[in-house]
Amino acid sequence: MEKNWYVVHTYSGYENKVKANLEKRVESMGMQDKIFRVVVPEEEETDIKNGKKKVVKKKVFPGYVLVEIVMTDDSWYVVRNTPGVTGFVGSAGSGSKPTPLLPGEAETILKRMGMDERKTDIDFELKETVKVIDGPFANFTGSIEEIDYDKSKVKVFVNMFGRETPVELEFTQIDKL
């Protein structure tokens, strides 16, 4: 059985409570091998009130929570019977199993929240020569001059038109030679 992302419908305004309840239930019922992550999709927004800027988190999908599950009868039961959960999105009728999100859909949502699904192993070093594999500089080679672990980016000096040109790239856009 493989793990997939599913969308769970909740009472609006109860998303964080459902997340907390579900995480407690997973732990108390020993379901960590079936239910992996519970995510309330949020993004930061800047509101201006009385001339003051304030950064607030807004729900991207009010009334919905994403859950990464290996779908079995037990895992379905645990999620479905969590207080505040009204059901799975994509299940037609009682007892039917829900439809998972497509892999790209979950990844897009997580990326939008800064929780990229695919974390790359970072074993690049300064001054290392790498090949650019994606983007407008694909197939160029260059030397790593800076590594920003927080942003998952590197600055690579690429030789273009006889000069070293600094290019900022994501870890996923480069490969070791």
UniProtKB/Swiss-Prot annotation:
Residues 128-156 form the KOW domain. The keyword Transcription applies. The keyword Transport does not apply. PROSITE patterns: NUSG (PS01014). It comes from the Bacteria. GO terms for biological process: DNA-templated transcription termination; regulation of DNA-templated transcription elongation; transcription antitermination; transcription elongation-coupled chromatin remodeling. Keywords: Transcription, Transcription antitermination, Transcription regulation, Transcription termination. One of its GO terms (cellular component) is cytosol. PANTHER family: RHO-INTERACTING TRANSCRIPTION TERMINATION FACTOR NUSG, TRANSCRIPTION TERMINATION_ANTITERMINATION PROTEIN NUSG. Participates in transcription elongation, termination and antitermination. Stimulates RNA polymerase pausing at U107 and U144 in the trp leader. NusG-stimulated pausing is sequence specific. Does not affect trp leader termination. HAMAP family: NusG. Belongs to the NusG family. This is Transcription termination/antitermination protein NusG.
